């Protein structure tokens, strides 16, 4: 199984034990190596202190005297895990956080008021010297390879892209001119590390903006770069530009493996190893991509955040045990503006100081009862069982999953369907007493004599007090998901949160004429900014989606939704069906009835406050660790 994925490969003499590389998306380098990745790329090593970092103008050069021990320990950790170690070599160029001025292809003033100076020959030479110095430091630190970032709108990409490069001298205009500085960088790097040291390069196949570099030019540049490099990793988008960034860190609204089509073309054009990153969600996807000859290597980013043991589980033919990435982007600091960064399915991510990598067995097994089998309840039951406890899981519905059962049926929610299948498989593998179709009562729970009780009964769909909602052809969001193919041509959706927008998109793709009414000023206000941008782009592709924001529904009468805009303007929308998606109401009062049975009682997830999968899974796991 997965024989192509786990075949070894060489890159300029360096042997990789399989075709899977850990992309530079997070720390936990040793865990990724222990999890089976053939090579782990540490990110990011800034090239030019004061001019490179997108995090801080004071970020130290990683190979300074007092940084060397830390960087060397990264290498040693990866080697202890049985993998090769690489490091991302990065220059932010005009996007860098700086104290005085930034360097770029052209002179201009950034939106934040920072001056960008067009690089002259002296500035270029200074940058080239820093590239040489940084790559020499990487070699000396023990890295087995270097990974040059030439994509995502960073300095080399800025010179390559007409979006940024408006120069009229020998470094602007034609591709040959725009490629001069990037090629000089590659030449300096190769001369520094020597002919037998593996050099990898990441490139954006498309920048996803009209003025960006053409894919034909990307392929030609890869050919130009071939004498200096040993491998190319194909990505897409621009990191700082949110319109383009949704194609760098894709959401579940985008196709799976979105960059594979470009990587295939690059591979056919060059004679170096070609890899791809982005949306490679399952071992079978990776196996098929390599078996078809489309790429040589796959890079996993968020997939290894969701499950650092992804590779090991695939090696052992246990794909059902892989915790799937949801492509929700909650792990991405830019998406959340650094608020509540985490992983929806891996409670340890960003909480490494508090959540251990391995679940420890409890000193004394206890009886644990979990009421509710949504994502939080299922995670609580699984983790409590792995702690050695005797677990009873009670669910009033005939199936496990809670709200996941409905969300998984949405057209763009294949990742959620995989998560639901994963949790169901994990529970089936464990000797958990699962009671489906069973209404939990305080009396029933008390009869089980629990030592610890987890209340995970979730939330109910909120029905606002609008006149006429009790009429025909009115339904809540979950009903609309299940009955999507039965709905009429004209659909009005009350509520433009993420679920309401997803329902609107699904119906529009089926040809329905959809209008979304949202009280606030923007759609999907409960989603992170990247997901919101992805929804906006999808909506723009559909002329049959209409949006009314800062708008409230006043009443439903005679088959029409009567509304009022913030400025007092009124109107009425005729509909065949109306969907109410105005949020969730926590079942907190129902939860209260279970308190007093046992002192160790904890309510988790949406029954305390509707807050999504990430919070429910984290709290369910944390409950189990404390029992």
Can you describe what each PLM-predicted range is?
Residues 1-9, 349-355, 433-439, 472-478, ...:
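Short gly/ser/thr-rich secondary-structure transition/capping motifs
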Residues 1-371, 375, 383-386, 390-391, ...:
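Flavin-dependent oxidoreductase catalytic cores
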Residues 82-83, 197, 272, 450, ...:
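A short helix->loop->beta-strand "cap" motif at the edges of active sites that frequently abuts
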Residues 232, 266, 289, 301, ...:
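Hydrophobic, well-ordered secondary-structure elements that form the walls
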Residues 240-241, 304-307, 399-401, 482, ...:
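Short gly/pro/ser/thr-enriched loop/turn and capping motifs at secondary-structure boundaries
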Residues 294, 427-434, 470-473, 539-546, ...:
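A short helix-to-beta-strand connector/capping loop
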Residues 365-393, 435-449, 457-473, 478-530, ...:
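Rossmann-like dinucleotide/flavin-binding elements
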Residues 393-430, 506-551, 608:
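Rossmann-like dinucleotide-binding cores of NAD(P)H-dependent redox enzymes
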């Amino acid at each position: 199984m997965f024989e192509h994925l786990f075949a070894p490969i060489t890159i300029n003499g360096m042997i990789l034990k399989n075709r899977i590389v850990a992309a530079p998306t997070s720390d936990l380098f040793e865990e990724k190596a222990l999890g089976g990745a053939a090579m782990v790329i540490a990110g990011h090593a800034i090239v030019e202190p004061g001019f490179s970092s997108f995090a801080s103008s004071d970020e130290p050069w990683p190979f300074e005297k007092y940084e060397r021990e830390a960087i060397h320990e990264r290498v040693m950790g990866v080697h202890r895990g049985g993998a090769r170690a690489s490091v991302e070599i990065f220059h932010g160029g005009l996007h860098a956080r700086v104290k005085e001025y930034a360097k770029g292809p052209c002179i201009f003033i950034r939106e934040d008021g920072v001056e960008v100076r067009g690089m002259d020959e002296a500035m270029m030479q200074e940058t080239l010297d820093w590239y040489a110095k940084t790559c020499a430091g990487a070699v000396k630190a023990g890295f087995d390879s270097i990974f040059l970032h030439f994509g995502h709108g960073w300095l080399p990409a800025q010179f390559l892209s007409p979006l940024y490069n408006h120069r009229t001298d020998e470094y602007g205009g034609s591709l040959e001119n725009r490629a001069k500085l990037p090629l000089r960088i590659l030449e300096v790097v190769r001369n520094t590390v020597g002919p037998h040291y593996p050099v990898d390069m990441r490139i954006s196949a498309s920048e996803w903006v009209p003025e960006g570099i053409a894919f034909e030019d990307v392929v030609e540049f890869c050919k130009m770069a071939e004498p200096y490099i040993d491998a190319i990793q194909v990505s897409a988008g621009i990191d700082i530009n949110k319109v383009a960034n949704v194609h760098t860190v894709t959401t579940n609204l985008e196709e799976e493996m979105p960059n594979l089509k470009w990587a295939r073309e690059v591979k056919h054009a060059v004679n170096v190893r070609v890899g791809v990153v982005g949306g490679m969600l399952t071992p079978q996807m990776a196996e098929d991509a390599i078996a078809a000859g489309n790429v040589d290597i796959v890079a996993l980013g968020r997939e290894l955040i969701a499950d650092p043991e992804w590779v090991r589980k695939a090696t052992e033919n246990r794909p059902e045990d892989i915790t799937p990435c949801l492509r929700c982007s909650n792990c991405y600091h830019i998406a959340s503006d650094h608020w509540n960064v985490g992983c929806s399915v891996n409670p340890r991510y960003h909480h490494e100081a508090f959540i251990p990598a391995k679940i420890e067995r409890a000193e004394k097994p206890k009886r644990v009862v979990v009421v509710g089998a949504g994502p939080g309840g299922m995670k609580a039951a699984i983790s409590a069982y792995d702690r050695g406890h005797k677990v009873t899981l009670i669910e009033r519905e005939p199936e496990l999953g809670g709200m996941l059962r409905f969300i998984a049926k949405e057209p763009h929610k294949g990742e959620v369907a995989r998560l639901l299948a994963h949790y169901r498989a994990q529970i089936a593998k464990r000797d958990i007493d699962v009671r489906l179709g069973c209404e939990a009562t305080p009396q029933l729970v008390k009869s089980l004599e629990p030592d610890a009780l987890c209340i995970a009964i979730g939330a109910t769909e909120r029905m606002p007090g609008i006149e006429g909602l009790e009429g025909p052809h009115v339904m809540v969001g979950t009903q609309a998901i299940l009955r999507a193919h039965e709905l009429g041509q004209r659909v009005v959706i009350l509520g433009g949160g993420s679920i309401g927008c997803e329902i609107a998109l699904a119906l529009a793709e089926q040809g329905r004429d959809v209008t979304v009414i949202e009280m606030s000023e923007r759609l999907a206000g409960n989603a992170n900014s990247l997901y919101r941008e992805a929804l906006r782009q999808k909506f723009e592709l559909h002329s049959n989606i209409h949006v009314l924001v800062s708008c409230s529904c006043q009443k439903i009468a005679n088959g029409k939704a009567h509304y009022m805009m913030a400025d007092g303007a009124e109107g009425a929308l005729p509909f065949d069906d109306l969907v109410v998606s105005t949020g969730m109401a926590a079942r907190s009062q129902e939860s209260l009835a279970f308190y007093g049975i046992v002192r160790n009682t904890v309510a988790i997830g949406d029954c305390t406050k509707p807050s999504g999968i990430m919070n429910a899974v984290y709290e369910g796991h944390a409950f189990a660790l404390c029992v």
